[in-house]
């Protein structure tokens, strides 16, 4: 009798991706975050779909439609807060996933890494547009400030901003198109995830040692399927605790005030997962320079494979590079903290120092340290 799992055209794809997939025998829990990101994406699409059934993308009714979801729709409050806090979990997993790729040298899988950078940009765009939809004060002013950054582009800047707005300010047209893009982008992200996995399965996963594991592979199921299941339990437990006990912990109180173009909030700031980039943007006094630094803070990830000068792939056996990696992590946490603070001293100088150190670490210190470690190998 033929095995349907191995012969059926559709089942064969699933089998090669999630069941009989040859996996390195030594991958740690840091490799769990890929599957957790898939779980987060599923949660976001399902909850988002139910929210879209009740939401209205009109400036006069958007805020009250979100209030209606929370008050009148069956379990609407839990759907809304799962979606809002699910985004935070999504970014937490994303940052750890990228960090693991940097630490263990997964960026040497060029195609997979580049699609990953595109995915990060797509998820950030989706999250930004989603934050605008409740049409609270922070939604409106966040949209105004961030879209206005494009006016820094020479010659075409202002035309571009008004084209995105669909008028002369953030208004009904802006909200409608942001809702349309926020709805369609997760499906584009899903397609990119599939491409990401196709490229990954061409080469096979990396492992903590950074050396080839072709001689020692084990099937994905049952070993890593159960390991991923444990990670999913931890993720869902954390998300449930967040949603049920303190759903507004990561949100901004200003967003419970309906959008008012005549009153500017005292501190305009994005959600916590954008604060590091926002701090880099604010640390440069020049508008165009700030926008370029903001773009580079993410796009620099695409340069990392070309800045890799070490003979070893992973930093597991490179203590100096390990120190630099954790300096980078501490630096990003500092930038996240600074992004949420008002623009005054000493926060300005701390933000500027951390921004310089961020680019200096990635562009100069890490490649030079790797070259020095190559010399040490010969001693």
From Swiss-Prot:
One GO CC term, this protein: respiratory chain complex III
PROSITE patterns in the record: CYTB_CTER, CYTB_NTER
GO molecular function, one term: ubiquinol-cytochrome-c reductase activity
Cofactor: heme b
Binding, heme b b562: 83, 182
One GO term of the biological process aspect: mitochondrial electron transport, ubiquinol to cytochrome c
Family per similarity comment: Belongs to the cytochrome b family.
Listed name of the protein: Cytochrome b
Organism of this sequence: Xanthonycticebus pygmaeus
Gene: MT-CYB
């Amino acid at each position: 009798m033929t095995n349907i799992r191995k012969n059926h055209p559709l089942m064969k794809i699933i089998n090669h991706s999630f069941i009989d997939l040859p996996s390195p025998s030594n991958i740690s829990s840091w490799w769990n975050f890929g599957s957790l990101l898939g779980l987060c994406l599923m949660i976001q699409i399902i909850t988002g779909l139910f929210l879209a059934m009740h939401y209205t993308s009109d400036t006069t009714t958007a805020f009250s439609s979100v209030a209606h979801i929370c008050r009148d729709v069956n379990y609407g409050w839990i759907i809304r807060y799962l979606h809002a806090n699910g985004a935070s979990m999504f970014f937490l997993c994303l940052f750890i996933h990228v960090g693991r790729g940097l630490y263990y040298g997964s960026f040497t899988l060029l195609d997979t890494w580049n699609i990953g950078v595109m995915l990060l940009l797509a998820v950030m765009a989706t999250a930004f547009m989603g934050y605008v939809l409740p049409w609270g004060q922070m939604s409106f002013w966040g949209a105004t400030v961030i879209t206005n950054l494009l006016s820094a582009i020479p010659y075409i800047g202002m035309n571009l901003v008004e084209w995105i707005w669909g008028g002369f300010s953030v208004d009904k047209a802006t909200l409608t198109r942001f809702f349309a893009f926020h709805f369609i982008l997760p499906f584009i992200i899903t397609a990119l995830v599939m491409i990401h996995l196709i490229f990954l399965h061409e080469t096979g996963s990396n492992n903590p040692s950074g050396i080839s594991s072709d001689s020692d592979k084990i099937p994905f199921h049952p070993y890593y399927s159960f390991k991923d299941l444990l990670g999913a339990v931890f993720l869902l437990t954390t998300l449930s605790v967040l949603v049920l006990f303190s759903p507004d912990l990561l949100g901004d109180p200003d967003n419970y005030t309906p959008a008012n173009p005549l009153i500017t909030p005292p501190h305009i700031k994005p959600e916590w997962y954008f604060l590091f980039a926002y701090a880099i943007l604010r640390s440069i006094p020049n508008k165009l320079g700030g926008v370029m630094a903001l773009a580079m803070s993410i796009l620099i990830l695409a340069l990392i494979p070309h800045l890799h000068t070490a003979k070893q792939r992973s930093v597991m056996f490179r203590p100096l590079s390990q120190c630099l990696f954790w300096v980078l992590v501490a630096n990003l946490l500092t930038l996240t903290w600074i992004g949420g603070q008002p623009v005054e001293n000493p926060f300005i100088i701390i933000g500027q120092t951390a921004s310089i150190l961020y680019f200096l670490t990635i562009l100069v210190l890490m490649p030079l340290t790797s070259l020095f470690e190559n010399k040490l190998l010969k001693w």
